[in-house]
């Protein structure tokens, strides 16, 4: 989720209780040390399996924006001295990690971190270099509160937000003896697009390229994930190198960096260059200028594990929508309701009966390929359509095209969501400033890593 997003519908839970440490050439277990990740020469990686949980969609308050998010990745770990169990959303689009903080009389307040119970908790004063210089990438500048502590406010496009003080604390990772002292936000106020689900998550683990992100503070050279999209084996997150002999060679696309701040360009996001869109191998007639960020930074393309679907700027979305609609004419029946726009951004939907789904109708859909410099993501079959929960017309279910219109969100960017990254090995190579992509079967890869069924 890039820094303006917070996903809440389908929850992918990372279970840290089942740590696996594997070498680059085998899947055998071995002891794990986090310090080994400070160098790209490390031959060890940490693998965390994913779990899924379906979250109801009918609790969203009416005063929030129509757009809301659908998927979060969370990790369970312990923080403080003595350790307190917490769960954090893994967000590749956010920088500052934060915990929901609450000073409670309970010995272990549910889904809250109590700083008063930790002897290692250390608040950051607003006069510190951390507060004055390392928060410059925040959308809202850090400020000084009445206690002269560094105060941070984070906000998202779905009207969710969190605010509190920056602090340093010890984060414990599994059985590792190499615990790390990290800067994070101790948030006393958290407001989300689904209050019921907000209470189930302690905080957020920022994974973008900002100086205060978890990945930057820990010094990881690389991390990868593979999402299968199935309940039996949802996938995994891998921290460290992925030079496995059995892994399909990755195609790399460079990460884009700019030196001059621009109002609509997120400089710490994982930004790549979208060069075109293909339908069944044929490039759509889209002007190249529409795919390149303009002088304000609007139009960047971000790869985001925290956003479920893919969003395209209006002209590009319109071109793809029109072409896909023409190619599915005679195959699918359009859902004719001019007032219905799924999640406020997806307005191309279809009525499909269970019988037609079982007959394999989705395999007849045209393949949509997102073309980048040096790599592609091809989306075909089931991932092209998403079944709208609890909406039926007669015996038919309603399925919507899984590409949305960024303009309807008021967002000046392209976002490649994880729904279209299913069964792809996605590697974030921070040392060489690039993203690697390769189609794989995530369940098979998980088995090779010793975590699949």
UniProtKB/Swiss-Prot annotation:
Alphabetical UniProt keywords: Aspartyl protease, Endoplasmic reticulum, Glycoprotein, Hydrolase, Protease, Signal, Zymogen
Tissues/organs with expression: Expressed specifically in developing gametophytes and developing seeds.
Phenotype of gene-disrupted mutants: Embryonic lethality when homozygous.
One Pfam family this sequence matches: TAXi_N
SUPFAM superfamilies registered for this protein in UniProt: Acid proteases (SSF50630)
Proregion residues excised on maturation: 19-57
Domain Peptidase A1: start-end pairs: 73-438
Signal peptide per UniProt: 1-18
GO molecular function ontology, one term from the record: aspartic-type endopeptidase activity
BP GO annotations: programmed cell death; proteolysis
Subcellular location: Endoplasmic reticulum
Family affiliation: Belongs to the peptidase A1 family.
Described function: Embryo-specific aspartic protease that limits programmed cell death during reproductive development. Possesses peptidase activity toward casein in vitro.
Misc. comment: Ectopic expression of PCS1 induces survival of cells of the anther wall including stomium and septum cells. This leads to a failure in anther dehiscence and subsequent male sterility.
Designated name of the protein: Aspartic proteinase PCS1
